[in-house]
Curated annotation (Swiss-Prot):
Gene name of the encoded protein: cheD
Organism: Oceanobacillus iheyensis (strain DSM 14371 / CIP 107618 / JCM 11309 / KCTC 3954 / HTE831)
Signal peptide span: none
Job description of the protein: Probably deamidates glutamine residues to glutamate on methyl-accepting chemotaxis receptors (MCPs), playing an important role in chemotaxis.
Keyword tags: Chemotaxis, Hydrolase
Hydrolase found in the keyword field: yes
Protein name: Probable chemoreceptor glutamine deamidase CheD
GO terms, molecular function: protein-glutamine glutaminase activity
Length: 166
């Protein structure tokens, strides 16, 4: 019997990557940021996006990193997965993050970055018809996540808590 050696591909803030088994994919530093995994339920291919902000407001800044924003990163992730052989009808999503890291005394919606990131990711996924299978969002704790494209499990590690599998 041959053992399969897995490697972990790390995704930074405002970044995204695509993997195939035997690779795993991980991102850390998810406070108000949202980690979105889109995967093909029938193949062993997946992508992970680590978004920082909800909307790109394109046109205000030249040369903006599209992976930084939920509205543009999800589109890039979706299209890249299709280019790599994923089947649109088999795509599913899991997400984590979107915490409210600081107590705010203002009622301003602009400062609710975590919840706004989650809403923007959910809207972008809905636009592409990608169902969200599971999520671990909100609260006030940072997260690290790791996805296995073979088992389709997302390990979510919160600070000072046990790992949960979603």
């Amino acid at each position: 019997m041959t053992s399969i050696e897995t490697t972990v591909v790390k995704v930074g803030i405002a970044d995204l990557k695509i993997i195939q088994f035997p690779q795993l994919i991980r991102t850390s530093g998810l406070g108000s940021c949202v980690g979105t995994v889109i995967y093909d339920d029938k193949k062993e291919i997946a992508g992970l996006s680590h978004v920082l902000l909800p909307y790109s407001q394109q046109g205000k800044q030249a040369n903006t990193n599209p992976y930084k924003y939920a509205d543009t990163a999800i589109s890039y992730l979706y299209n890249e997965l299709l280019k790599r052989g994923a089947n649109q009808s088999s795509l599913k999503a899991k997400l984590a993050g979107g915490a409210q890291m600081f107590q705010l005394r203002t009622g301003s919606d602009l400062m609710r970055i975590g919840p706004r990131n989650v809403e923007s990711v959910e809207l972008a996924l809905a636009e592409f018809g990608i169902p969200i299978v599971s999520k671990d969002v909100g609260g006030n704790l940072g997260r690290t996540i790791e996805f296995d494209p073979r088992s389709k499990l997302l390990a979510v590690r919160k600070i000072n808590q046990e790992v949960i599998m979603i």
